[in-house]
Amino acid sequence: MNRFLRGACAALLAVGVISTMSCSSDTRKVAEVGGEGVELQEYRYYFLNNKRELYGDDAELDDASVAELKKMCGENVKNRHALSLLAKEYGAKLSEDDDAKLDELVEALKSNYADDDAYKAALTADFLTEELYRELSGDMLLAENVIARMKEKGELPADDDTTSVDAALRSDDMACVKEIYVYYPSDETREIALNRANEAYSRLMSGESFEDLMREYSSYSAEQVPYDAGYYTMRYDALDEVWAEVEKLSPGEHSGVFESTYGFHIVLRCEKDADYMAEHREELYDIYSHSKFYERFYALYDTLTVTMTGYGDKLDFRGLSMGEK
């Protein structure tokens, strides 16, 4: 689930700081995506956070490092502007209620600081301006408004149309999955995890119960994944590697051992339980509608390219900082 709403926006909220400080150069256009301009304050936010994560704040960048960071920034800004362009396509905008929510969010964050100086001091720590914070926070609300427009246009069933919602959940787009998942936290423990996954698979092939092996080997707890019912998922909700295996299977079939960025997996595709789906209709339809949103989102994302402006080409990315003008 490394997608737009639960990825980039969740990371933003985890930052938890904003700033009122801004300068006119912050709105200079560094790049263009799909006909939309990318302002310095946005590009800089991604560039400096990516630098912090990969190399550290004080690292001296060479040409290869700058190129890698600019590539990552390209993916970041394509994410944001794919949403903006999709919203325009559907006529989705932030409402007055949304603006009020953003005002409340900003005021709540301001209250975390002893005074205005402390509030402003957060700027250099997290590479944000208040304007950009509002924009990034508003993206989550905007995405929900796009989903609402998809329902209004009939591309998704209305929430209260339970017959159509149930039909959507019964479709092959959604799968019920049980999973033996063996997590490894570091490269040093990878071989241990692989051996455990292979041992579980060997016992599975010898006729032992998938559910019993889930309980014995899986890194999931019963609270995270209901062992008896499994979990319901779709493309763009499941990990890419997991969904690639699940969609190959018919109900009752299981995969071999495969690896994702999070560990080793064996998945079993199960028959869906109508009673369980009815009981959890709202939760499952939320997964369904968001996955269909991502389907449209990434279809547009894949058409976009990032082009640097003349101003962006002249920026000294090795020395880029919050004081950049």
Features from the language model and the residues they span:
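Surface-exposed patches in mature extracellular/periplasmic domains of secreted proteins
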Residues: 59, 90-99, 209-216, 255-258
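Residues at alpha-helix boundaries and the short loops/turns that link adjacent helices
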Residues: 77-81, 116, 140, 144, ...
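Bacterial N-terminal signal peptides that target proteins for export
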Residues: 1-9
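N-terminal targeting/tethering segments
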Residues: 24-131
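Second-shell loop/turn segments in exported
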Residues: 28-34, 67-73, 83-94, 107-108, ...
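Peptidyl-prolyl cis-trans isomerase
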Residues: 199-241, 270-271, 278-279
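PPIase-associated folding chaperone regions across multiple families
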Residues: 33, 61, 121-192, 215, ...
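C-terminal motif of bacterial Sec signal peptides marking the signal peptidase cleavage site
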Residues: 18-22
